[in-house]
């Protein structure tokens, strides 16, 4: 039960509905699960992966293309699906962006501006069936639920100094002001301004001050403990379902939370046109049927797709015929890092950190890159963040430092105290040959076919990586570091499932305006089984340059509003095919 599950449960119980939430993992709350000093254990959180799903029970199979056999992911690597109450919303960092207005209409904008031939062969990007303006009230509400700290750039159409001048217009300022800058962010502002960019504070759902959200949930100011990503917040400072929604849900009439409940499949009527409920395994391994009038798939994005494929909800995507919708347009995030190393006069103190704090700019994001000149479609942000580091999580040493011995110890000490990094987070387009389906060879711990991921980097994303990393390295030169470490993806680079990059997995059950090209309609409702809804990052037709959580939360509120105001009154398809 992550952000989507908590939001939907809150909204539907507000409407007087009875909601049963089935969570595959244990119950968790700030007290006692994230309490100090229990939670600040690098070995437990970042090595043993206490808050992540068990790959022994449930994992994915991965391959680069459709001509090879996939192999299961046996170690947590490229991304980190959560488990337990709070889901990935409890162990995220806190970066909280809104998608840009142009992100909703990327295909239309590209084709209108540059012609249809601008899209490379096999690129399958699609417009969202909704607009930024549709979601603005829900972006706003989610920020206020989360106590997001930041600085608006355009409020009610008027540009405001200090914010993002390229953002969509917002109806009001952030609920809290920006977090304090750490040293790397101060240097980032200096370099970005020198290059003519427009830096602004990263919107962060890490509270910069005391706050009470619209539900009455309290937050305290972040103390820069450095344990955001991989961990639950010990201080009620990082927004999470546990701290910002569940306190008003627990004990509420009509709300039934069942933990250690692994959903196996969605049950359908004999004609496959309606869901009747789900089957799940309880903590004792007993299979139970839970009837339901409405089924909301609120798992991690990959597993929403997995459940749809296992249950026969919608036609599975066929990469050969390009037909079917469930599994198509899987996408990811294009991430690269550049580390800067300084002498002893620059004290970075990497052990301090705030998950979403720092600085970024959008001058290279959205539609501000001309693909006829840069050679790629999309964009990205360059940012400075310091979410916290430590010896167990790893210390990036300067170029030339050996990997062992006394010289390594010296280099690690210098790097820990006198270095920081900038990151390039790029968009990732979708393609005909990047998709999700059921693996024919491997099964999970419950006897079900594993979800199979077919994905690799395409030339578009490799060129984008090289372009954006080049811009980041140009910024670094302004600061005169002793050394710079970090490279862009090289031509022919392959996706590496073993190396952590980002938990921003998107697509696979996308929203659209045509049942032949999308699994869900504009309200996140299945075209094929209208009492099944699947809000989440799985609905993105491709990925933009931002973290997806702000968009995921807004879509959950958008979906819940449609259920409350339309579906309950007149059950059935909310959009006619």
Question: For the regions a protein language model found, what residue spans apply to each?
Answer:
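A glycine-rich dinucleotide-binding beta-alpha-beta segment and adjacent secondary-structure elements
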Residues: 202-205, 224-228, 259, 264-267, ...
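Glycine-rich loop(s) and the adjacent beta-strand/alpha-helix scaffold that form part
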Residues: 11-14, 18-21, 25-42, 251-252, ...
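Patatin-like phospholipase A catalytic core
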Residues: 138, 151, 155-220, 368, ...
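Conserved redox-cofactor binding core of oxidoreductases
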Residues: 45-47, 51-61, 71-78, 90, ...
């Amino acid at each position: 039960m992550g952000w989507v599950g908590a939001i939907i449960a809150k909204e539907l119980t507000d409407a007087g509905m009875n909601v049963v939430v089935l969570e595959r993992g244990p119950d968790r709350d700030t007290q006692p699960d994230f309490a100090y000093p229990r939670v600040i254990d690098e070995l437990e959180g970042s090595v043993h992966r206490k808050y992540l799903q068990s790959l022994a029970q449930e994992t994915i199979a991965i391959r680069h293309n459709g001509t090879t056999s996939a192999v299961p992911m046996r170690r947590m690597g490229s991304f980190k699906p959560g488990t337990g109450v709070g889901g990935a919303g409890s162990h995220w960092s806190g970066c909280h962006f809104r998608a840009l207005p142009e992100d909703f209409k990327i295909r239309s904008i590209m084709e209108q501006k540059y012609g249809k031939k601008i899209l490379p062969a096999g690129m399958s990007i699609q417009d969202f069936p909704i607009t930024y303006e549709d979601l603005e009230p829900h972006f706003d509400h989610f920020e206020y639920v989360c106590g997001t700290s930041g600085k608006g750039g355009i409020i009610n159409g008027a540009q405001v100094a200090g914010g993002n001048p390229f953002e969509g217009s917002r109806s009001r300022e952030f609920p809290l002001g920006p977090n304090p800058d750490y040293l790397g962010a101060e240097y980032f502002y200096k370099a970005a301004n020198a290059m003519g960019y427009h830096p602004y504070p990263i919107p962060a759902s890490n509270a910069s001050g005391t706050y009470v959200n619209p539900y009455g949930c309290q937050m305290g100011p972040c103390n820069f403990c450095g344990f955001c990503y991989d961990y639950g917040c010990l201080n009620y400072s990082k927004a999470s379902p546990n701290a910002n929604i569940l306190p008003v849900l627990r004990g509420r009439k009509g709300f039934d939370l069942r933990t250690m409940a692994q959903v196996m499949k969605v049950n359908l009527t004999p004609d496959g046109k309606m869901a009747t409920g789900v089957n799940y395994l309880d903590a004792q391994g007993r299979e139970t049927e839970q009837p339901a009038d409405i089924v909301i798939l609120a798992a991690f994005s990959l597993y929403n797709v997995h459940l749809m494929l296992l249950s026969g909800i919608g036609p599975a995507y066929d990469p050969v015929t390009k037909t079917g919708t469930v599994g198509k347009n899987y996408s990811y995030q294009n991430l690269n890092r550049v580390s800067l190393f300084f002498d002893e006069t620059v004290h970075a103190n990497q052990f301090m950190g705030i998950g979403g704090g720092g600085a970024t700019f959008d001058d290279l994001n959205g539609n501000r890159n001309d693909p006829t000149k840069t050679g790629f479609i999309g964009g990205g942000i360059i940012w400075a963040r310091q979410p916290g580091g430590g010896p167990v999580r790893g210390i990036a040493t300067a170029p030339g430092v050996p990997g062992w011995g006394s010289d390594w110890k010296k280099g690690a000490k210098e790097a820990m105290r006198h270095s920081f990094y900038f990151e390039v987070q790029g968009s990732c387009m979708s393609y005909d040959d990047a998709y999700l389906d059921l693996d024919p060879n491997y099964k999970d711990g419950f006897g079900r076919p594993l979800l199979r991921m077919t994905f690799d980097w395409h030339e578009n994303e490799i060129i984008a990586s090289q372009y954006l990393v080049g811009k980041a390295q140009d910024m670094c030169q302004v600061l005169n570091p002793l050394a710079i470490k970090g490279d862009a993806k090289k031509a022919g680079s392959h996706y590496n499932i073993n190396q952590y990059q980002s938990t921003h997995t998107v697509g696979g059950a996308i929203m659209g305006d045509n049942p032949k090209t999308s699994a869900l309609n504009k309200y996140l409702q299945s075209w094929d089984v209208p009492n099944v809804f699947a809000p989440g990052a799985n609905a993105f037709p491709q990925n933009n340059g931002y973290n997806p959580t702000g968009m995921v939360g807004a879509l959950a509120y958008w979906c819940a509003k449609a259920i409350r105001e339309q579906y309950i009154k007149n059950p059935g398809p909310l959009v006619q095919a």
